[in-house]
C-alpha cells in the first residue's frame, strides 16, 4: 500500500514538474520572403520553448492594426521609414526590436527592354504608400524617366515630379498587388520576393534596382512598446539571425540571386 501511494505521489510530482508549456508567439507577415523565412525558424523556436504561429496578411495596413490591438505579438513586413510614417498617421505605440532582410526593389517591364524604349504616354504602376512610392520615384529618376524636386528623397510623391519628358502617367497600387498588374502596364515598381512567390516572371529581369545604400529600408521585427524587452521576442530575433534554415529560406525566396537582397544584421 505504501509503495502504491509512493508511486502515485511520484507520478503526480513528475506531472507537476514536467515540460513547461511552450509560449505561443504570433507573428504577422505578408506572403513571400518574410513569411517563408519566419516559418523556417519554427522548429528551432519550438526546441527553445516557443510555439511560433504565423498570421498572414495581404496588405500593409492590417499588420500594424493587429499588433497595436494585441492580436499578434510581432510583425515582420515593414521597414523603419514605413513604420515611422504609420506611427505619425495612426499614433501607434510600436517599436522596432530587430532587423532582418534588406529587399532590393526594382523597376520591371514585360514590354520594354530598357528605359530608352519606354514610349511617350507610358503607364507606370507604383506603390500607393508614401515611403515606397518615393523609393520607386527615385529609381525612375535614376533611370532618366522623370526628375523630382531637389531634396525630397524617399519622401517624394508624384506631386513632386518637376520634369516628365515622356509624359508618363501613374497608377498607384497597394505594394503587394504590384506584381499582378505588371503585365498590364509599361513599367512597374517590383518587389523580387513577391515576384518569386507569385511565380509571375523573372525577378532578376529588372531594369534597375536599389542596393545596400538603402539599408534604412531593411525589414524590421516590430512589437508593441510595452513588450519590447520581452525575452521571448528577443529570442525570436536571435534565432532568425543565427539559423542556417532561415538563410536558406531567404535565398530561395529571392531566387538564389544575391543582387536581390542583403542580410542587414
Which positions does each model-derived feature cover?
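Beta->alpha turn/N-cap motifs
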Residues: 32, 56-60, 70, 74-84, ...
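Pocket-flanking alpha-helical
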Residues: 60-92, 106-108, 113, 136, ...
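Periplasmic-binding protein-like
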Residues: 132-141, 240-261
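Short helix-initiation/N-cap motifs at beta->coil->alpha
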Residues: 54-65, 152-180
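Short, well-ordered beta-strand elements
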Residues: 23-32, 50-56, 123-124
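A conserved helix-loop-strand patch within extracytoplasmic ligand-binding domains
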Residues: 97-147, 247
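A bilobed periplasmic-binding-protein/Venus flytrap-type ligand-binding module shared by bacterial periplasmic
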Residues: 104-115, 217-232
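Ligand-binding "clamshell"
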Residues: 85-97, 111-112, 184, 189, ...
